[in-house]
Amino acid sequence: MDKIKLGVLVGGTSIEREVSKKSCENLLANLDENKYDITVYHLPADGNTEWAKNIISNPPQIVLSALHGGNGENGSIQGFLHCLNIPYIGSKVLSSAICMNKAMAKTVMKANHIQVPDHVFVMRGVDFSQYEESIKLMVFPLIVKPNRGGSSIGVIVARNMEDIHYGIKNIMETYDDDVLIEKFIDGKEINCCVLQGENGPEAMAVLDVKKAGSVFVYDDKYHIDEYSSDITSLPDFMQDMIKSIAVKTFNV
């Protein structure tokens, strides 16, 4: 039986480049080389597109992306592969673009009656005074995060307006043009993966995620010694509710 020609994308220009490398290492360690003829495409930090010429001249049968953040998750890479008629694993162009933009994703979910935390969306170039009253109506502590970032990079817990100003300044100088300020929810961190199967979307097991503090931060996610998740001990009816919400969100 011929091996499947599998292309794996890694690197990229995103600030999450190092996370991408770790994901790629994990993928390669678990892919069966007896089943797949694997080509790794390294996307350089400087944006050089030589990798794209290689994938065009010798296209794989399918692509598995280990890219994190930026063009790797916002629909850009997905659109590129779509235009080349190269199948790829993961969300398609529109869903990738929406999900990478947290404010847009929350707007879409609210329109479909899926509960999301209260938030204020702060844009670069708009005077802060236009947001200040809305923020003051929220109850501290609040979460301040990049609107289009991942891996918890740039996320802080704000306990007063001084923290809010610091968080916005830090994010806009380093990570993103737009900032999301959200209600802080001190509760369980739950994961529920949804996969599209032959019979439609199916929710996987509900997992409890262990975290070192009250916020699920970068170190919790990517330092293996500190990260763990287990099948939840939540009652069955709560697990069913979580799975139902996960599938509904997937379908949206």
Across the structure, where does each feature detected by a protein language model lie?
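ATP-dependent carboxylate activation and anion-phosphoryl transfer catalytic cores
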Residues: D2-I4, H113, P235-V252
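Generic secondary-structure signature for well-ordered alpha-helical cores
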Residues: E33, I114, E173-D177, K211, ...
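Solvent-exposed alpha-helix faces
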Residues: E25-N26, K169, V247
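Phosphate-binding site of ATP-dependent enzymes
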Residues: R159-S244
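Active-site nucleotide/adenylate-binding loops and adjacent lid/helix of ATP-dependent enzymes
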Residues: D2-L9, I38, I55, I98-E182, ...
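ATP-binding N-terminal substructure of ATP-dependent carboxylate-amine bond-forming enzymes
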Residues: M1-L94, I98-M100, M104, M123-E132
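Glycine-enriched alpha-helix->loop->beta-strand junction motifs that scaffold or abut catalytic
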Residues: N85-P87, I114, N199-G200
